[in-house]
Amino acid sequence: MVEFKSFIKNENLRIISLLAFILPTLTVLISYFLSIKYNYVIFCIPNIEGCTSISQVGRYPPVNYFFKIFMFVSIFLIFLYWIFNYVLISKKGLLLIHKLTFFLGILSVIFFSLYIIFLGEGDYYRFFRRIGIFIYIFFTVISELLLSISYKKNSYLFKND
């Protein structure tokens, strides 16, 4: 049986990083077009016109079943992304700031999960969606910044990988 730590390599981290970007992007796009088909949202260019939100396209059945399933798979990929980064940097003996980075990354995953769980209508759902997405974005930005600084400062350790 292959040990988990031996499976964690730069190539696998690259694949997980790409999947963690592509899967939620495709999920949102497909959910958007399905929401248009079911008349939950109007056709527009959301990035330019601001006519709908990601929450709105994944809120109503049957689209929300598709949306939530694939977003939870995305959350799992993001979780793996943080695990892989932590193990790769731990192999090099860099633990001090990376423990904080890992902790914030995992917190962001937890709050992203809360955001997905609380998709729905009403003030109760709206409150938890806003809290979940705000904290997710905040912790993601901070943890990615710390991760980038860690890799940049210690880039000489990763030259041969």
Where are these regions (language model features)?
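Alpha-helical transmembrane segments and their helix-start/interface "positive-inside/aromatic belt" motifs
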Residues: K5-T25, D161
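Membrane-interface helix-boundary motifs at transmembrane edges
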Residues: N10, V87-L100, K153-D161
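Alpha-helical transmembrane segments of multi-pass membrane proteins
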Residues: P24-F43
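Membrane-interface interhelical loops and short amphipathic "cap" helices
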Residues: Y40-P61, L119-I131
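Interfacial helix-start motif at the membrane-water boundary
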Residues: S53-I75
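Transmembrane alpha-helical segments in integral membrane proteins
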Residues: M71-I89
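Membrane-embedded alpha-helical bundles of multi-pass transporters/translocases
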Residues: L100-I110
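Membrane-proximal helix-loop-helix units in multi-pass membrane proteins
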Residues: S108-N160
